[in-house]
Structure formats: structure tokens, C-alpha cells
Amino acid sequence: MGNKQTIFTEEQLDNYQDCTFFNKKDILKLHARFYELAPNLVPMDYRKSPIVHVPMSLIIQMPELRENPFKERIVEAFSEDGEGNLTFNDFVDMFSVLCESAPRELKANYAFKIYDFNTDNFICKEDLELTLARLTKSELDEDEVVLVCDKVIEEADLDGDGKLGFADFEDMIAKAPDFLSTFHIRI
């Protein structure tokens, strides 16, 4: 009937609004983006809450992620299945956390997951080495990498255990004025 959307029920849209930083228009825009990634897989009608997983290989081709050296890690951090495949809910969560309105604490939680390559709930020297390799496209020599990693741990490791727990990480990014402006993507 007319221009009334039939992708989601009103209750679904209300629920998305309640648990994200988006309005109804944003949710519909996100669905359109999700649909564009895999039109043969993603239904236009979500009123019966279908569970559809779009593969990471398609998600990382989005313009917002394509050039990001952490694109796979970002997608994995939001993937319920742990393989990087995203449901629509995962996709909305990713955009919600990475939107400008999301609070620093929420962004910090996901940033920590992204940099914790070995998923041991710490950012250790090996995690920092992998981070540096991605940021510098492996252009630093081994001595430079060791120096940078040692310096980061020396300055950010508040409890002296040789690795960064979440509290150490949160304290470190609180001192980074550009964290909020760089840890986001737009719809």
C-alpha cells in the first residue's frame, strides 16, 4: 500500500532503534547496503527474521572497508559465527559501533578485540607486531618493530605484566585524541 516499507515490521524497526544508534531511515539504508552485497542471498522481506549469513569475502569489498588493513579483523569482531560471516544483525552492530554516535567505551571494546589477534584477551607483543605489520605494510625492519612494540608496552602496561589488558588499552586510547574520529565509518 503506497510507500509503506514492508522489509521489517514496526516492532523490528523499534527494536533496532532501541539497541543501536540509528533511526528507522538508517536501518532501512543499512538493509539496502546489506542487500547490495549479496542480492541472491539477502531477502527483501525480513518480517519473518530470516537468518542469512553474507560471507566475509563480500563484506570486505565494501568501499568503507576495502582499503582498511584490519578489514578481516573488523568483520571477525562482529561475526557471531566467528568466521567473519555476518547476519543482518551483525552488520547493523558493526555499523552502530563504528558510527560517530557510539561512545568511546563501546568503540574501545571492539578495537581491543580487533587488535587481540590471538584472542587471549590481552594485547601482547605478538599482537602489536601483527598490528604494526598491517599499519606499515611490513616496511619496518625487525629491530624497528621490536623497538616500537617494546616502547608501546613500556608506556601502556600499567600493571607491568608485559602485555596490555583491556584497562591498559582503554587508558592508552583515552590519551589518543584522534581515536574517536578515526574509529568510525558512515552508512
Swiss-Prot record:
What are the GO MF terms of this UniProt record? Answer: calcium ion binding; integrin binding; magnesium ion binding; protein homodimerization activity; protein-containing complex binding
UniProt xrefs under SUPFAM superfamilies: EF-hand
Would you say which domain of life the source belongs to?
Answer: Eukaryota
Q: Which GO terms describe its biological process?
A: calcium ion homeostasis; cellular response to ATP; photoreceptor cell maintenance; positive regulation of cytosolic calcium ion concentration
Q: What is its main location?
A: cytoplasm
Which residues make up the binding site for Ca(2+) 1?
Answer: 116, 118, 120, 127
Leftover remarks? The binding of either calcium or magnesium significantly increases the structural stability of the protein in comparison to apo-CIB (calcium- and magnesium-free form).
* UniProt name for this protein: Calcium and integrin-binding family member 2
Tell me the organism.
Rattus norvegicus
